[in-house]
Amino acid sequence: MLRTAIRNNVQVSQKRTYIMSTIASTFLGSILFSKNNQLASKMENGELHMPKDPTLSYLNNNNSNNQAEPYFKRREPDYPGHVPLYNYEKFLMFLGSSIGSFFHPEENKYIVALGESTAIEPILKKLQKTMLSDEIGRQILKEKPRITSTSLNLDYLRSLPDNTIGKNYINWLDKEGVSPDTRVQVKYIDNEELSYIFQRYRECHDFYHAITGLPIIIEGEISVKVFEFMNIGIPMTGLGALFAPLRLKSSQRKRLREIYYPWAIKNGIYSKPLINVYWEKILEQDVDEFRKQMGIETPPDLRNMRKEYFARKKLEKQGKL
């Protein structure tokens, strides 16, 4: 009897153990199965180890065709003809135009690109502030005049008295064989008003030549660039003053160093801001009176100095000096 009882107790204990283990296995299995179902669902939905990108969700919700926007997209232009550039594009344009301007200064495309790639926003905003602080400067920014052969009426300028600004300007254009229509439209500078300020500087450049009497030969251009840099502050003009003389002869560098650089630095610093001159409205004014008002002295005649230099060199070769 005792053995039978013991045997029965063992069987009951084994059943209980089996039942408990079965219940535990079933419970754990259901949990694991539920987890597996959740993992499978996440894998199917692409959520496992790859959380949904909120950017992609936004694009999917807002793009009916489920097509993502291109990663690089050029922004909308600020004004007609504007070409927005990334900073690295501006830097590459600066490098290319710098090299091109140094080896081929006669190529206007390099000068144009160098000017716009170096016309950084802080400099243009400073010019903008200069113009906004002056009554005439504000008028220029408001009216945005353009300097062309049509707007100036070159035939009318030829009819003006000899010592007027207009006659002085047209005489210089005719003598140098240039036209106000050759100034390229600005397109790489952001902000419409800042682009106009640079355009205004570009179109007024020939007036600076005319009132100083400096020709468009390399020494004359460098001298005007220094004058502009000291007065207006356009970076390209300063770069031209630094690097352009490296390609000149020693006699040319000597003239610049001893005569034209000192003149340009002094007059550029002490004269009134040229960017605030409304040239179109003072064409009938006496040019000498204008120079006096602005604080500009005329430099020595560069062409005559070159003629005298070459005449002297010729006499030296002939042994007459």
From Swiss-Prot:
It is an enzyme of class 4 (lyase). Zn(2+) binds at residues 205-206, 209, 221. It catalyses: a 4-hydroxy-3-methoxy-5-(all-trans-polyprenyl)benzoate + H(+) = a 2-methoxy-6-(all-trans-polyprenyl)phenol + CO2. The keyword Mitochondrion applies. It is a peripheral membrane protein. This is Ubiquinone biosynthesis protein COQ4, mitochondrial. Lyase that catalyzes the C1-decarboxylation of 4-hydroxy-3-methoxy-5-(all-trans-polyprenyl)benzoic acid into 2-methoxy-6-(all-trans-polyprenyl)phenol during ubiquinone biosynthesis. One of its GO terms (cellular component) is extrinsic component of mitochondrial inner membrane. Its cofactor is Zn(2+). Pathway: Cofactor biosynthesis; ubiquinone biosynthesis. Component of a multi-subunit COQ enzyme complex, composed of at least COQ3, COQ4, COQ5, COQ6, COQ7 and COQ9. This protein may be expected to contain an N-terminal transit peptide but none has been predicted. Keywords: Lyase, Membrane, Metal-binding, Mitochondrion, Mitochondrion inner membrane, Ubiquinone biosynthesis, Zinc. InterPro entries: Coq4, Coq4_euk. It is found in: Mitochondrion inner membrane. Belongs to the COQ4 family. One of its GO terms (biological process) is ubiquinone biosynthetic process. The gene is COQ4. Its main location: mitochondrion. PANTHER family: UBIQUINONE BIOSYNTHESIS PROTEIN, UBIQUINONE BIOSYNTHESIS PROTEIN COQ4 HOMOLOG, MITOCHONDRIAL. It comes from the Eukaryota.
